[in-house]
Amino acid sequence: MMLQRADGLFTSVSRSDADVSDAKALWQDVYCGEFGWLGVGSDPRADKYHQRSLYAVCRVNGGLPVGTLRIVHEDDPGFYITEKLGTAPISRYLSKGIEVQRLMVRKEFRDRRLPEAPFGIYGVLVKVCLYHALAVGAEWVLADCHRDIDIGPLKSMKAMGFEETGHSYRDSINDEECIVLIIETKQWISNTLRNRSRFNKYLVPDDPAIRMET
């Protein structure tokens, strides 16, 4: 699936070699180089979630990757969250849910607004997540978010309607507390239609600046 934007920013969602390679580059630049959370050479292809994942990659200036997230589809052995918590605490969400992992934006683009990304690269990635949930019929979106890290989007996610499940765990990559969040897709759409904020108007899948390809 391709979300194509006219003014130099485009976002692709796939498991193509190009998207996975650019996701890997961002993992290395952000999670390894900037924060020291991953080892040199960490590769999305090397873990057990890769074969049932899609990678959203935002690119600008003819191809520079500036943001990414991974969308994992449910299957045995579950999600990263269930690896940490077990399946019992969130079992009702698993059969028709997706998990969002490894959302990151290159440092120099975190606070930038572009004509085609009025809420920044993070806003584009959130929109991708909603579009994908609707496209595949996912009823729930699971996510986790560091509670005490300044760049974490916990406040923004809760403002969109994500709710804390009451469960948390220590992230193995940095020993920080991660809060497990959940949103029902139909509730997310309802929220965006009921509360017509600028961001919600941007999120609703009725955007002439975006072309979706399958």
Segments and roles (model prediction):
Residues 1-45, 50, 55-57:
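Short amphipathic alpha-helix that is part of the acyltransferase structural core
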Residues 19, 33, 59-63, 131-140:
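Secondary-structure boundary elements
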Residues 38, 70, 74-86:
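A short, polar/charged loop-to-alpha-helix boundary motif
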Residues 57, 63-73:
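Conserved beta-strand in the GNAT
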Residues 60-63, 108, 184-188:
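Short loop segments at secondary-structure junctions
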Residues 84-178:
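Acyl-donor binding region in acyl/amide transferases
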Residues 172-200:
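C-terminal "cap" of GNAT-fold acetyltransferases
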Residues 198-214:
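Short, cationic low-complexity segments
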